[in-house]
Regions:
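Right-handed parallel beta-helix/beta-solenoid
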Residues: 2-59, 305-312, 321-323
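Glycine-rich repeat segments that build the extracellular carbohydrate-interaction surface of secreted
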Residues: 34-39, 55-79, 89-96
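Short glycine/acidic-rich loop motifs that flank beta-strands on beta-rich extracellular proteins
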Residues: 68-69, 79-82, 100-104, 117-125, ...
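Right-handed parallel beta-helix/beta-spiral solenoid domain characteristic of secreted/periplasmic
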Residues: 88-150
């Protein structure tokens, strides 16, 4: 392989491994890497190595510029808004699969990357409100508050430098363990990726989206997720979305709660969604309002209900738009 000279690198003392052994990390060509240790950091630190990590995510947010990365460990207990006019930032929890801390055995008492509400949370405020495009949240255990979302996607009607729009957000490899909503789009933002996450025990919705400033949830990809033990699943104003290879349990109260609704009534121009290759604990008889709802121009194909297959016998799939 030919050697490629990409110019200078910033060398950082410290690595991304759980043992935090001394190593050298090469910063990518564009952007700065910031570190947050919510247990042992200090906001007076420079924030550019694990040894000099910030204590709070707030400090990392005020330090970050477009294209940066923020790695964190420990338990963040803050309610924040992403900074204005800062785009394309990745917030990444270190560790393996997101988990709760355990009191025993010794060594398991500190989970590697959790984001939870503070001890005295501000009412009706999300853990993080995303206000500009291109932010990504990865490998995080979310423990939400009882009256608002873990992640809130925001959009307003301003223009120029005053415009706020959370389009192109990515939520990847996270676990939403509790709270009111998992992801809430209150403005109608486009091109959101929700991939390989687990949604559990949320008391309102796993994903809730409305049409407001934007027409609805256009060009979203909701793929490879597990929706398990929730009250209501997904309810969005879907426009040209792809919902594929997800598994859904049957909601808090079968026949009266939402499992998957692509036609939230506040949207404009809903339809042309591809809802394919999903698996539902919901029975075929309940592929209708309010459990499973589509639009006339959607493509619903190769979806399996709990009773579409008999034990030991080749099964059938659900085709066509549910009512």
């Amino acid at each position: 392989m030919a050697f490629m000279n990409f110019g200078k690198r910033t060398l950082l003392a410290g690595d991304l491994k759980l043992n935090r052994g001394v190593d050298v990390l090469r910063d990518p060509i564009i952007g700065t890497t910031w570190f947050v240790d919510a247990t042992n950091g200090l906001d007076a630190n420079p924030g550019k190595t694990w040894a000099g990590a910030f204590l709070t995510m707030s400090k990392a947010f005020t330090s970050a510029a477009s294209g940066d990365r923020i790695y964190f460990t420990g338990k963040v207990r803050e309610q924040l808004s992403t900074p204005a006019q800062v785009f394309d930032v990745r917030v990444i929890g270190i560790g393996t699969r997101p988990r709760h801390a355990d009191s025993t055995p010794a060594g398991g008492e500190t989970a590697t990357a959790t984001w939870a509400a503070p001890a005295s949370p501000t009412a009706a405020s999300a853990l993080v409100r995303v206000r500009q495009q291109g932010w990504s949240f990865e490998n995080i255990l979310w423990v939400g508050h009882t009256d608002n979302a873990c992640i809130e996607l925001y959009r307003d009607a301003e223009s120029g430098n005053s415009e706020r729009d959370a389009g192109h957000t990515s939520v990847i490899d996270c676990r939403f363990a509790s709270g009111y909503n998992g992801i809430s789009d209150i403005g109608g933002v486009p091109n959101v990726l929700v991939q390989h996450n687990r949604f559990e025990a949320l008391t309102n919705f796993c994903i809730l989206g409305v049409g407001n400033i934007g027409a609805g949830q256009s060009d979203w990809e909701i793929v490879d997720n597990t929706f398990d033990g929730f009250t209501n699943g997904v309810k969005i104003s879907g426009i040209g979305c792809r919902v594929q290879n997800n598994t859904f349990t049957d909601g808090g109260t079968p026949n009266t709660t939402v499992v998957l609704n692509m036609a939230n009534t506040s949207g404009v121009g809903m339809g042309e969604n591809f809802v394919i290759q999903n698996f539902f604990q919901t029975s075929t008889a309940n592929f209708n309002t309010p459990d499973v709802v589509g639009n006339a121009t959607d493509v619903w194909a190769v979806n399996a209900s709990i009773d579409s297959t008999s034990a030991g016998v080749g099964g059938n799939f659900e085709w066509g738009q549910p009512a």
